[in-house]
């Protein structure tokens, strides 16, 4: 009987240990922001001669995207430059502040007419088309896109996409 009791106690403790395991498994994060083919936590260097590069960020949430805020910090994409093309330095892709801003974001390819970001569980932030433009300013940067995602359960995550053109002279 004692042997069975000890066995049962050990089984319970083992089960409890496994069930309450506190590992940092990134697969269970409620919000993820990851570079496609690159580490978003490191500077993305654009080294092609024509300043082209695929710069796509994958964004996913379990509960649906509530906000996808983008803040631009760049030595060349100043507030004046961005205002000239009707783009603020900070905007919410899931909730554009106006129809005019939504149309501007669609025109830049940051939004789609056919796919809403708010409520979706995954989307991409693709700035590939802007790399030749940024490289054309002949300022290596850094050019930062601060991405903040909030899901419908209130979970938040921010990551900074930093782009640099090492072949350009300051």
Regions of interest found by a model, annotated:
Residues 5, 13-41:
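Bacterial Sec-dependent N-terminal signal peptides
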Residues 1-7:
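Bacterial N-terminal signal peptides that target proteins for export
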Residues 2, 23, 131-133:
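Short secondary-structure boundary micro-motifs
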Residues 29-170:
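First exposed extracellular module after export/assembly in secreted or surface-exposed proteins
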């Amino acid at each position: 009987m004692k042997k069975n009791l000890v066995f049962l106690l050990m089984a319970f403790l083992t089960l409890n240990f496994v069930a309450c395991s506190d590992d940092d498994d990134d697969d269970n994060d409620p919000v993820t922001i990851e570079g496609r083919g690159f580490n978003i936590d490191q500077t993305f260097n654009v080294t092609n001669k024509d300043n082209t590069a695929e710069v796509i960020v994958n964004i996913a949430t379990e509960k649906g995207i509530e906000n996808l805020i983008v803040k631009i910090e760049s030595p060349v994409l100043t507030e004046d430059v961005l205002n000239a093309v009707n783009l603020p330095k900070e905007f919410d892709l899931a909730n554009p502040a106006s129809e005019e801003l939504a149309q501007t974001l669609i025109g830049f390819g940051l939004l789609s007419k056919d796919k809403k970001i708010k409520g979706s569980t995954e989307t991409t932030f693709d700035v590939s088309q802007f790399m030749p433009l940024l490289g054309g300013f002949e300022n290596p940067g850094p050019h930062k896109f601060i991405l903040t995602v909030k899901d419908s359960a209130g979970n938040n995550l921010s990551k900074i996409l930093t782009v640099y053109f090492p072949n350009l002279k300051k």
